[in-house]
Regions:
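Inward-facing hydrophobic residues that define packing positions of alpha-helical scaffold repeats
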Residues: 75-78, 162, 169, 213, ...
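Acidic, glycine-rich segments characteristic of secretory precursors and extracytoplasmic regions
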Residues: 1-34
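TPR/Sel1-like alpha-solenoid repeat signature
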Residues: 106, 193-200, 212
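Short coil/linker segments at helix-helix boundaries
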Residues: 119-159, 163
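Conserved, well-structured interaction surfaces
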Residues: 48-121, 156, 173-179
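Extended ligand-binding clefts on enzyme/binding-domain cores
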Residues: 5-8, 12, 160, 204, ...
């Protein structure tokens, strides 16, 4: 049972661990994106991969189902930490942890919804961004009981999902602790800026994409790959 700030931190670490699952960023979901986009080839005749290659996925496709479940599980753990009555009441006793945990939870939630809207929503475009139910359901409060878990949440528009992602990342950038105070593997300001640059790129807002990418590049803390073409040869295994 969650009673203390330490309990909430363990739950937050569970949300980070959820990112590593195969249905989120742990492996086969990302490979599935490559197969759907024809950047990769399904060279095995298994049901899931053949469906994805042919763009005929249905509800029983294990890769799609795991993507949905694992990502929403991580989002819900983040919501339980910082965006639930219980989490908020516990964090009220420690304002420093409150700001940090809310920023980290916002980052995880943004990453999750960016993953989901690209997998299950329409691409962001002026002609489709405001069509009802073409995004994914937005759950912004932690689900703490079975009754709430089974409530039907309608899909939001693509525009609404992207607006939430951007709002969460802006909050994370403003409130994440400095990099020297962050344990390895946890969200950083530069990580949030890099993700926000990618979000704006997918939104076709190239000015803001360049703005946040340049902020990360200009820190001079990271090396840039000088030969991207080398990463896409058939023999490339990285």
């Amino acid at each position: 049972r969650i009673k203390t700030v330490d309990d909430l931190e363990n739950l937050l670490l569970g949300a980070y661990n959820g990112i590593r699952s195969s249905g989120f960023w742990g492996g086969r979901t990302l490979r599935g994106f490559d197969v759907i986009a024809d950047d990769g080839v399904a060279d095995v005749a298994t049901f899931e991969w053949v469906q994805m290659s042919a763009h005929t996925m249905n509800l029983v496709n294990a890769v799609g189902r795991d993507t949905w479940t694992a990502t929403y599980n991580a989002i819900n753990m983040a919501n339980q930490v910082a965006f639930s009555d219980l989490g908020e009441s516990i964090l009220a006793s420690d304002p420093q942890k409150e700001a940090q945990f809310k920023a980290e939870a916002s980052f995880i939630r943004a990453l999750g919804y960016f993953h989901l809207v690209r997998a299950f929503g329409l691409p962001y475009a002026e002609e489709t961004k405001d069509i009802a139910e073409m995004g994914v359901p937005l759950r912004l409060r932690g689900v703490m009981d079975r009754a709430t878990a089974f409530e039907v949440v309608q899909r939001s528009t693509v525009s609404e999902v992207y607006s939430q992602i951007i709002s969460d990342l802006e909050y994370a950038i403003e409130n994440l602790p400095g990099e020297n105070k962050v344990e390895s593997g946890r969200a950083t300001v530069d990580g949030a800026k890099a993700l926000l640059a990618k979000v704006y790129f997918y939104k076709h807002d190239f000015g803001n994409a360049a703005k946040y990418a340049e902020q990360v590049i200009n820190t001079q803390k990271y090396d840039l790959d000088e030969d991207l073409t080398a990463k896409f040869g058939r023999a490339e295994k990285k």
